[in-house]
Amino acid sequence: MKSLIYGYGKTGKSFERYLNNKKLNFDIYDANISKFNKKYDLKIFDQILCSPGIPKKKFEEIKKENNNVLTDLDIFFKDDTSIKIGITGTNRKSTTAYHLHQLFNIYSSSNLLGNIGNPVLDSINNNKKYSIIELSSFQLDKMRSNKLDFGILLNIEVDHLDYHGDFELYKLSKEKILLSKDSISYEMNPYKLFEWITKMKAEKIEFENL
C-alpha cells in the first residue's frame, strides 16, 4: 500500500510517524514547503491522508481524484481501543477538554488529544482507558464517520466562515459530533438551540453551566 500525506504540519508529521511505525511506503505533499511541493497524480495512491487545515474547496477536489481520503481521526477510530470522548464548540472546548482530562486521571487514565493535546495518531493504544479529544469544525467536517463513544457540544457562534462559507455549513460540521452516538451532551441555551438537536436519536444530557 502506498499513501500520500497531504499537508505537512502537526498532523502531517503524525501521519509520517504512524506510517513509519507500520513500515508503509508514502510520499509527502505540501504546497508551502519547497521540499515537498512536487505535484503528484493522486490516482496512483492507495490512500490520501489529509490534514485538517486543508481548505474545504481543495479537500473536495482531492476526493474527486481519489475516493480513499482519510483523516487522522478516521485512522484513530479504526485502530484505537480506548473510550473516545469528543468535545467541540466555538468557545471553551480547550478548557472543557483539559478539566475532563484532569478529572478522568484522578479516577482512571486518560489521553488529552487534538488541538489542545497530542496528535491522536501518537496515542494509539497507549494503555489509557479514555481519550479526551478536542475537535475543531475542520476536523469534524473532514472525518468520514463518527466513531466517538460520547460527544460533547458546547456553544455555537458565528466563526470560521472563511472556511465553511456560511453559518449553516459551520453548524452542519458541528452537528457531526452528535451523529451515530449512544449518548451526547450539549449546552442548554434556549436562544441558540437548533432544531436538529431535537431530532437526534441518541440519549441527550442537557446542562447549563460548566
Located regions from the model:
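Short, basic phosphate-binding NTP loop
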Residues: 1-86, 208
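Short loop/edge segments at beta-strand edges and connector loops
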Residues: 30, 35, 71-73, 113-117, ...
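Short glycine/serine/threonine-rich phosphate/pyrophosphate-binding segments
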Residues: 12-15, 93-99, 119, 135
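Conserved Rossmann-like nucleotide-cofactor binding loop
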Residues: 11, 34, 118, 138, ...
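Conserved substrate/cofactor phosphate-moiety recognition/catalytic segment
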Residues: 29-36, 105, 109-127
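Flexible active-site lid/hinge loop adjacent to a nucleotide/diphosphate
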Residues: 127-210
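Walker A (P-loop) phosphate-binding motif
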Residues: 72-116
